[in-house]
Amino acid sequence: MSQRKYTLDLLKDAGIQGDKTAKMPLEDGYKVPREGEIEDSKAFHDPKLYRKLVGKLIYLTITRPDICFAVNQVSQHMQVPKDHHWRMVERLLLYLNGTSSLGVWMGCNKSTEVVGYCDADWAGDRADRRSTTGYCTFIGGNLVTWKSKKQKVVSCSSAEAEYRAMLKLTNELVWIKGILKHLEIEQATPMTMHCDNQ
């Protein structure tokens, strides 16, 4: 599944043309800046354009889990976007310019094994010290759900942030189990959860 045409239309709307691309959605080693940390923090001149493009990027995450974290970051500044937020959107668009045909591949597999992976960055947002949870789930080796979302509360330790991520993934796995049961699809093996705690 891919949204290549949608991506190309989005790039056209944004005025991205030519061969210029970016290798990653965000700069290598990206950290959420603290308030006042970036000198060029004046308001972006066209917040309506910012909101329109970020809204389209949010829709694109349906088939592009590789951009979820970056879109999560730029979508937090919809009310008063700054110039440096716009540069993040531009970089994301350049990344899409080089990867417009990517999507989610679904293979033919009779396995119903459900596996989930989760991670959290402890206090990754240096402005409010909240962590971001990320998880993805696979059925029979096929990616079926994914999410990147800022946690609602500040975690006091990396272990707490990881447990919160595992809770979100557990909720997702229980939901998937219910859907499989409703569809009368039997699971031969127990669900597996993997969590990175480094």
Language-model regions, residue ranges each:
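Long, low-complexity, charge-biased intrinsically disordered regions
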Residues: M1-Q198
